[in-house]
Amino acid sequence: MAKTNISPGMQQYLDIKKDYPDAFLLFRMGDFYELFYDDAVKAAQLLEIGLTSRNKNAENPIPMAGVPHHSAQQYIDVLIELGYKVAVAEQMEDPKQAVGVVKREVVQVITPGTVVDSAKPDSANNFLVAVDFDGCRYGLAYMDVSTGEFCVTDLADFTSVRSEIQNLKAKEVLLGFDLSEEEQTILVKQMNLLLSYEETVYEDKSLIDGQLTTVELTAAGKLLQYVHKTQMRELSHLQALVHYEIKDYLQMSYATKSSLDLVENARTNKKHGSLYWLLDETKTAMGMRLLRSWIDRPLVSKEAILERQEIIQVFLNAFIERTDLSNSLKGVYDIERLSSRVSFGKANPKDLLQLGHTLAQVPYIKAILESFDSPCVDKLVNDIDSLPELEYLIRTAIDPDAPATISEGSIIRTGFDERLDHYRKVMREGTGWIADIEAKERQASGINNLKIDYNKKDGYYFHVTTSNLSLVPEHFFRKATLKNSERYGTAELAKIEGQMLEAREESSSLEYDIFMCIRAQVETYINRLQKLAKILATVDVLQSLAVVAETNHYIRPQFNDNHVITIQEGRHAVVEKVMGVQEYIPNSISFDQQTSIQLITGPNMSGKSTYMRQLALTVIMAQMGSFVAADHVDLPLFDAIFTRIGAADDLISGQSTFMVEMMEANQAIKRASDNSLILFDELGRGTATYDGMALAQAIIEYIHDRVGAKTIFATHYHELTDLSTKLTSLVNVHVATLEKDGDVTFLHKIAEGPADKSYGIHVAKIAGLPKSLLKRADEVLTRLETQSRSTEIMSVPPQVESSSAVRQGQLSLFGDEEKAHEIRQALEAIDVMNMTPLQAMTTLYELKKLL
């Protein structure tokens, strides 16, 4: 279409769209947000809405699609969830008063990392991440725009950057052009992230600590610049920038957290069946977020851990007070996100009522905490700011039955503002005045069915049917004529109507102004509200951990400086919860000062992986301050956990490859210290037997001689158990079994020493493999076991058979029994007497193919 044919309105659209080429532009036109051109075509497909066109009769109609403004949020949510950006252009003036084209401007750009409003609010964090690289180290900053949380750190390598982004579950990452193409490809293709590029850095340093490194400062500034650019307003709810160090927390990669099912079950991608699910007895959205953060980042400071333990113990010892506390927390709304809505100018009357209701609960919560009469709890109590003046303002100003939208009126309480009360009185009494006029004129005119009605066009009027027109008084004046009636007005009615309309307009305008003023006053309290939110969230998580500890009979773990692990009758907390206490079989775990490696053998399904995960979860729960599932626990403080738990167990099915195994093993042996915990399950099984065994042995020796980390190494390579004679810090353990009358029972108990058998064929039997196959497997196993093979682990293995021999061996494994059975069934099904010669030849040919 030639530019000269474009209407002024469409030219305005194109001018705005030019500035937001990577976003869907929602262009407000009356009661709809319209999309045009390619945006319309693509949005119609993604949102499943109708695609029409503007100027349908033109040579080149403009594709157009639209959504109602009152339900636009649900459509925006869909686009954001799919990874797109949305720019919202609003009408900046009343169309009735506009001269020419209505002025429109983009008021916000919504991206996957900057979501504040949602039709389906989620209590989880939504982090936006920025990364900068100075050629040596990486700066990483993250922010949750919906809560104001703002943090920064620096990292040594891209592997750490990738892991941190995964741990944060970020959906959008801001970059400069300093990351390599390979690194950007990993972020986009492997991690499914939206990349946005931001070169400029925010100039206002008021939110940025001067102690930051240059690369951290750049990452944080880049993040601030992007948020201000997309949100287009001052964000008073952004919290002071917090600098953190990865080493201040128990370090775990995303793969480790996934394999341990910390925040979601890796198989189902659901919360159910995770540690988060188990420990979540929180009552507030803020508490839920903080609990997840504690699980993600267990502590390494003994002092901080013991502080949490002490408060949990106090809560455990006072059931009645703790129950009252839990019930009071149920009345606490999401202060962090309510504060952000205030800051964004989006808080509605319901939001302020929720904030007021929360503040009304705070004195009760504070009194309950004081009743525990504990010095450690008092530290929390002393920091609680009840904000009574803000609670009073909201309680006296906002009507408890106020609607969710500002435009509906009836927001401000009667008695809060004299002028507003006057206008409301006029409207209220005006209704009575109109009723009086109606009664007076009905009696004076003799028109028995005379009544006063109202519509927007004619205002208030007397409704007179045609049959009564002769009775209409002289002071009535005609306003409208209908088919069977006429509408009349009077000077008195017009005067009352004018007073009422003026009162309604003034009341609506004044009420809006009062609400805006109250919201502005609330905004001045945001910093105090955020501090209160943190304390209430902490209290919520601690009471949650106390409830879980009492419900599941957990104990308070101890810590030592001797590198000793003592767990008596420990349980895998999540498995126990799913199975039930009566079904679960506990296991003790012991590492003395001299022991660094446990080599565990035993068949699949016997409990090796559960045993390993049990130790990891016990460590994580202990170091986040929680009580743990055992009769007694004494642990060293670990600085990191490294795992490689393979795909044979259903927990992370389909994720294991030999390359991933080796990469994760490499990360462990390079990054682990003697204060780390390493859990390797069946390492080396993804390659040839001797290759796998050789790698497994070499890795064990490396950890033993150079790393010194506490390690559990599960293996099917029985030959590796002889390492205990050569490595002084390695001990063998196995999963006990009971063998009776040819049947094998897995006892799920860990015992000292190596396993004497693998029981792989028994596991195959449980899996339901054909009996003939199992019988053949027994024959092959017997033959292999009788062959003379060296079991000396350091010796060179015998030469591998030729590929043809291997193929023959693979074929002979199954034998001819099943094939013969198949041929026999085919022969028995033949009706020889009724076959034609051609059918007989065809059947013979098919039988021959079975040989």
Swiss-Prot record:
Protein name (Swiss-Prot/TrEMBL): DNA mismatch repair protein MutS
Similarity field: Belongs to the DNA mismatch repair MutS family.
Cross-referenced PROSITE patterns: DNA_MISMATCH_REPAIR_2
GO cellular component labels: cytosol
HAMAP family: MutS
Function: This protein is involved in the repair of mismatches in DNA. It is possible that it carries out the mismatch recognition step. This protein has a weak ATPase activity.
Cystine residue pairs: none
Keyword RNA-binding: no
Gene behind this protein: mutS
Keywords carried by this UniProt record: ATP-binding, DNA damage, DNA repair, DNA-binding, Nucleotide-binding
Positions that bind ATP: 602-609
Cross-referenced PANTHER family: DNA MISMATCH REPAIR PROTEIN MSH1, MITOCHONDRIAL, DNA MISMATCH REPAIR PROTEIN MUTS FAMILY MEMBER
Classification via InterPro entries: DNA_mismatch_repair_MutS, DNA_mismatch_repair_MutS-lik_N, DNA_mismatch_repair_MutS/MSH, DNA_mismatch_repair_MutS_C, DNA_mismatch_repair_MutS_clamp, DNA_mismatch_repair_MutS_core, DNA_mismatch_repair_MutS_N, DNA_mismatch_repair_MutS_sf
Entry's Gene Ontology molecular function annotations: ATP binding; ATP-dependent DNA damage sensor activity; damaged DNA binding; mismatched DNA binding
GO BP: mismatch repair
Native source species: Streptococcus pyogenes serotype M5 (strain Manfredo)
